[in-house]
């Protein structure tokens, strides 16, 4: 203790000496500063005396009048209140005051909520919502909604088994296997037929090659009983999942030749991969920077799953417009960033137009701001790496780009596996851990889950593994070259059709197009005419357009597709009204209607019919 006292005494003496030695220096500096500032202070005082004082002298009488009026009004108001409360008991005055305060607070809360609603939905939508509450308009909307439901149900239910066998309750006795197979064959006759290499449907069917399909079916059968949640029971499935993740990471800038820290997890599809990445990024940024009101910046062309994620996870969605080339730029993203931004998104490519956003620029903006950056490669993940190796012009888009923190890519699309598998990758395990769910106080035991699902199909994981092993790099190169050539030939031929033009410059196998003169050619009527000829193109909006996604099943359809497009355009140019029935009126209404809520109600009605018949 004595040593401690001596140490403190010595420290105190050192501090005292330091202060004594510093005091003259500080005083000298202050003196010099005062001497330097003296002329400026004199000038400021002179200006105030010459200009400010006369101005205040002129304003002073006016201010005195204003003050007198305010004082008089205040006195009048207090006198009126005193008169109105005259004769009331103190408790009555207190009660009236409490009621007035509560009513005022209620009114302020209501106004705040109303203004927030207007800010969120926009003034036009808010005005439309108010008009729809008026008695006459409300009844009209209800009647039109009923008519729409009747027509919609009749149109959709055409594809159901009219008069055929249906099972709406469990049969009293189980049916024999042969009868079940026979029933399935009859039901399958209502589906769109597919000929190998000659699909008439945009995207949808990504598997190609009879031998490849047979292999995957066999693999699925062998592992149909497995569940990776029980890794100790099915270690083979765990091993296959690890290998799928490793092979996928190595394709897109991870692995031994890239960033070895890239890691991930398998999901049920692209939407779940996107949802998982958004959830992980939100929670990571909350832990890292304490962001409690998260925002996510996406392009207008970003996949709908990001809109779904924003709704699910209470993340404010900030949508930025695309340029004339349909790409999201770094400048647009930079303008949208705030202190609450947790994630920015770039598409590689975007679903609507097949173009790749400025991933390098967007990732740089995100890195500078210290926020996460996701590149959505659900479509491009199993095409762009091989297109690049084949020599096609592919901008940087994967984990080789600094600042990219997560990625989604679908093994069940161009990875050519069975439907139900996708991959979400992260720059590091430090981000991936935020997609996990861990429960430590459950009576059922300690619980950890890598994603939203508990049980998962080991059979689907095994088919993804088998597909990648069966195709190999050589197989993916061959199929990619075939698809790129088909898409290129279609894009070139499309530009020869008068009345149509490309919507963006396609980066891979998605080719979007629109009318060069929308008033002269209804692109949705064109889609209806093509549907009558058996084609199933994807209809887009904002702006109105169509697209064709080429897969391994479209090797031989380019010429026939271009031929039918040319003939249908010729028909519409002669008769612009097109056909009476079809989706053109609905899509046309959706593209111009300012009432987005009524369009949303139509979509809900459509989904209800699909689920209930």
Regions found by a protein language model. Give the residues of each.
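Active-site nucleophile and cofactor-binding loops and adjacent substrate-binding regions
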Residues: 236-237, 264-271, 298-300, 504, ...
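Active-site C-terminal subdomain of aminotransferase-like
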Residues: 369, 374, 386-509, 513-519, ...
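Active-site phosphate-binding strand-loop segment of PLP-dependent enzymes
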Residues: 328-375
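Non-catalytic terminal extensions of PLP-dependent enzymes
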Residues: 2-238, 242-246, 250, 255-257, ...
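PLP-dependent aminotransferase-like
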Residues: 286-342
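Conserved beta-loop-alpha segment that forms the PLP phosphate-binding cup at the N-terminus of a helix
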Residues: 241, 245-246, 260-291, 305-309
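Short Gly/Ser/Thr- and Asp/Glu-enriched loop/turn motifs at secondary-structure junctions
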Residues: 259-261, 503-510, 541-545
């Amino acid at each position: 203790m004595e040593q401690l006292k001596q140490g403190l005494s010595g420290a105190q003496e050192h501090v005292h000496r330091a202060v004594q030695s510093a005091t003259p220096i500080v005083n000298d500096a202050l003196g010099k500063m005062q001497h330097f500032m003296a002329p400026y202070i004199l000038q400021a005082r002179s200006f105030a005396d010459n200009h400010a004082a006369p101005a205040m002298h002129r304003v002073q009488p006016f201010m005195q009048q204003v003050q007198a009026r305010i004082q008089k009004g205040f006195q009048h108001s207090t006198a009126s209140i005193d008169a109105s409360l005259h004769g009331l008991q103190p408790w009555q005055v207190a009660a009236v005051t409490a009621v007035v305060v509560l009513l005022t607070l209620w009114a302020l809360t209501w106004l705040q909520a109303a203004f927030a609603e207007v800010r969120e939905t926009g003034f036009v939508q808010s005005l439309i919502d108010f008009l729809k509450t008026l008695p006459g308009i409300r009844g009209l909307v209800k009647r039109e909604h009923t008519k729409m439901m009747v027509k919609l149900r009749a149109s959709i239910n055409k594809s159901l088994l009219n008069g055929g066998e249906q099972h709406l309750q469990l049969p009293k006795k189980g049916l024999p296997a042969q009868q079940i197979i026979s029933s399935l064959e009859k039901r399958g006759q209502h589906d769109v037929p597919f000929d190998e290499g000659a699909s008439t449907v945009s995207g949808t069917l990504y598997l190609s090659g009879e031998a490849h399909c047979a292999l995957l079916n066999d693999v699925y059968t062998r592992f149909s009983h497995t569940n990776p949640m029980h890794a100790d029971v099915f270690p083979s499935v765990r091993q296959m999942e690890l290998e799928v993740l490793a092979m996928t990471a190595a394709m897109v800038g991870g692995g031994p030749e890239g960033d070895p820290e890239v890691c991930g997890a398998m999901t049920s599809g692209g939407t779940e991969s996107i949802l998982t990445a958004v959830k992980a990024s939100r929670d990571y940024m909350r832990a890292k920077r304490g962001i409690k009101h998260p925002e996510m910046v996406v392009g207008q062309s970003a996949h709908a799953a990001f809109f779904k994620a924003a709704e699910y996870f209470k993340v404010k969605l900030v949508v930025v417009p695309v340029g004339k080339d349909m790409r999201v730029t770094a400048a647009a993203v930079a303008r949208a960033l705030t202190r609450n931004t947790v994630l920015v998104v770039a598409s590689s490519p975007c679903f609507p137009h097949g173009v790749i956003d400025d991933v390098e620029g967007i990732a740089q903006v995100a890195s500078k701001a210290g926020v996460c950056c996701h590149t959505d490669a659900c479509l491009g993940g199993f095409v762009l790496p091989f297109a690049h190796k084949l020599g096609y012009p592919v901008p940087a888009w994967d984990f080789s780009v600094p600042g990219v923190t997560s990625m989604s890519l679908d093994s069940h699309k161009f990875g050519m596996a069975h439907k139900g598998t996708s991959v979400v990758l992260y720059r590091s395990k430090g981000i991936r851990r935020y997609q996990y769910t861990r429960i430590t106080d459950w009576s059922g035991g300690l619980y950890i889950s890598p994603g939203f699902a508990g049980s998962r199909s080991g059979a689907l994981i095994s088919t993804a593994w088998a597909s990648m092993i069966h195709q190999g790099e050589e197989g993916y190169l061959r199929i990619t070259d075939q698809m790129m050539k088909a898409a290129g030939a279609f894009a070139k031929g499309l530009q020869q059709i008068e009345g149509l033009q490309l919507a963006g410059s396609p980066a891979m196998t998605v080719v979007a197009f629109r009318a060069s003169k929308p008033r002269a050619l209804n692109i949705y009527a064109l889609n209806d005419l093509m549907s009558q000829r058996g084609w199933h193109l994807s209809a887009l909006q904002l702006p109105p357009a169509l697209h064709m996604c080429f897969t391994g099943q479209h090797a031989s359809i380019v010429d026939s597709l271009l031929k039918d497009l040319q003939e249908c355009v010729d028909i519409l140019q002669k008769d612009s009204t097109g056909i009476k029935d079809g989706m053109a009126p609905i899509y046309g209404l959706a593209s111009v209607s300012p009432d987005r809520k009524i369009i949303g109600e139509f979509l809900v009605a459509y989904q209800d019919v699909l689920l209930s018949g």
